[in-house]
Regions:
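ATP-dependent adenylation/nucleotidyltransferase module used to activate substrates
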Residues: 3-173
Length: 173
């Protein structure tokens, strides 16, 4: 395939699996338009749905220490989810962070500020650094293009395992 860029976004043929429609729009943009956008309501209807969800979670977790658990990387997305859950939804989330050896000082600082600012609890699971390095080296040697798989697998499995062990039913992502 010759070089091509989506007529709607910046995705291009550097993604070897990308496909374009007859108008030059990539499959990612088309998927967003047909699948995500019709269900994406940031207005009054979305706020009402979020409030209803919060009330259901609160009713379901009466008498428990936490309403939900949120995986926290220290980046923008998970930090915003934590803010929305605690401040907008009025939930009592437990923030769950996995230290797989790659924490930057900025991420650690972001996490500390967020926890202090929201007044919520944080649990950090520390992954064995030697095992993580061995996995990452194995993925590199195997030529696997997605080098985040070892960390992502550790993050999600630790999060869900902790939630199950501690009977925290609601996971917010």
């Amino acid at each position: 395939m010759s070089y091509k860029i989506c007529t709607h976004c910046i995705m291009d043929t550097s993604d070897p699996h990308i496909q374009f429609d007859d108008h030059g729009v990539c499959e990612y943009c088309n998927n967003f338009k047909t699948t995500i956008q019709p269900n994406w309501d940031t207005g009054a209807q979305g706020a009402a749905a979020l409030a209803h969800m919060a009330e259901q979670i609160k009713a379901d977790t009466q008498g428990k220490e936490f309403d939900a658990i949120i995986g926290l990387s220290g980046g923008l997305d998970s930090s915003y989810a934590a803010y929305i859950a605690a401040k907008k939804m009025g939930l009592r989330p437990l923030l769950f962070h996995v230290d797989a050896g790659w924490n930057t000082d900025q991420a650690v600082g972001n996490i500390e500020k967020l926890v202090d600012g929201l007044g919520v609890d944080l649990y950090t699971e520390v992954i064995n650094w030697e095992e993580m390095k061995d996995l990452q080296v194995a993925f590199l040697k195997a030529g696997i293009p997605d080098q985040d798989i070892p960390q992502d697998t550790a993050f999600f499995s630790a999060l869900y395992q902790f939630a199950r062990k501690n009977k925290i039913k609601h996971v917010i992502t």
